[in-house]
A protein has these predicted regions:
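Membrane-interfacial hairpin junctions
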Residues: 310-324
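Non-membrane alpha-helical secondary structure
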Residues: 4-8, 28, 320, 329-332, ...
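A domain-level signal for the mature, folded cores of soluble proteins
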Residues: 1-137, 150-289
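Juxtamembrane boundary at the C-terminal end of a transmembrane helix
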Residues: 344-355
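Short beta-strand micro-motifs enriched in acidic
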Residues: 144-148
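Single-pass alpha-helical membrane anchors
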Residues: 290-310, 325-344
Length: 355
């Protein structure tokens, strides 16, 4: 067996720990659980009056989850709340750890690396609106090894929904100085195996990935809650099923749920995922030019069509004659179309491209 004892476990998570490249324009950086806890308030709205705990410890997170039988709480009755001042993340980034957990399944070892953030940033909807932002973010990368030899088999790059997650075979995994490389998307933090523009949801919520800021974090070893090596005072956050992020208000469900769920092995069937196309940085530049040109054409023909309709059905003047009234009506109609487009973009991103 490749894995024998706890000393092996720490050395294994260290050996396969990745190098991350963040986008050079990133403004929401990673953070540690301890940093989040000491700057947060844990709220339980199921008591009367509500119970507030601050600063928070891992033992607090474990105890409140145990109190409610480790049930998933999504309604905003239990919240680990923190303010916007934490959104930029913890500095210096070189001191921020990631978390590594080892599981075995079907003759394979899975190392689950977890990265924490205080903020998931916004997506720009073709430059007209932003959507997808929310407090807190947890990203996952999984390394699959042969249980007997320790040979690298695959790497799972976690990125948002199943539509963009991907298992990458060992031969195609990027390496640098013997380390696996993962590229982190701008603001949304999805992980990918190479830089470029990730085409998502028909271009509505693209991810932008580049070889920008290098981050090679140390790994804190954690264990599953059912393991005899599990230490609640150090790992209690992994048992937390309440809302991670948001205000202290009852019913605030703006934060995420799932710190505990991020410790599971993802579906190992690669066919279950639908990874998007990643365009190279060079190709992306041309695509942006084409996209901007297409948007201008669309706007032009919308305005042109509205003007003609205004002339025909409202003004009823000679063809091609547009007066002040026509332009006012055109502006109003066009503004309404833009608002509809923005609402549609928000709906599509939140429903089909969750962050």
């Amino acid at each position: 067996m490749y894995l024998k004892d706890i000393s092996d476990e720490q050395s294994i998570v260290d050996k396969w720990s990745p190098i991350f490249y963040l986008h050079s324009d990133e403004k929401y950086f990673p953070c540690s659980v301890d940093w989040i806890n000491k700057n947060s308030v844990l709220v339980d709205h199921n008591t009367s009056p509500p119970t507030y705990v601050s600063p928070v410890t891992n033992m607090d997170l474990y105890n409140i989850s145990k109190k409610y039988n480790f049930e998933r709480r999504v309604s905003g009755d239990i919240i680990l709340s923190f303010g916007k001042e934490l959104y930029p993340g913890e500095q210096p980034i070189k001191n921020v750890p990631i978390y590594g957990l080892i599981r075995s399944q079907n003759g394979k070892i899975y190392i689950i690396y977890t990265v924490m953030f205080a903020r998931n940033g916004e997506y720009s909807i073709l430059g007209l609106a932003d959507a997808g932002q929310h407090p807190a973010d947890i990203e996952q990368m999984v390394v699959e090894l042969d249980e007997n030899t320790g040979e690298l088999l695959r790497v799972f790059y976690g990125a948002h929904s199943t539509w963009v997650r991907k298992w990458v075979d060992a031969k195609n995994v990027p390496m640098e100085d013997g380390k696996i490389v993962a590229y982190m998307a701008l603001r949304g933090h999805g992980l990918y195996e190479r830089p470029g523009t990730v085409f998502r949801l028909f271009g509505l919520s693209n991810d932008y990935v580049e070889k920008g800021i290098k981050w090679q974090p140390k790994v804190k070893l954690i264990f599953p809650r059912d393991s005899p090596k599990y230490v609640p005072a150090e790992m209690g956050w992994t048992a937390f099923y309440g809302r991670f992020g948001g205000t202290t208000e009852k019913g605030d469900a703006s934060g995420i749920v799932g710190a505990a769920e991020k410790q599971a092995i993802p579906d190992t069937d690669a066919s279950k995922y639908h990874p998007p196309v990643i365009f190279s940085p060079e190709t992306s530049e041309y695509l942006f030019m084409i996209k901007d040109f297409v948007i201008l054409l669309i706007v032009y023909f919308i305005v042109f069509g509205v003007l003609r309709l205004t002339d025909k059905f409202i003004v009823r003047g000679p063809a091609g004659s547009y007066e002040f009234k026509d332009h006012v009506v055109t502006i109003i109609i066009f503004y309404a179309l833009v608002q509809i487009y923005k609402k549609f973009g928000h709906f599509m991103i939140n429903k089909y491209a969750p962050s």
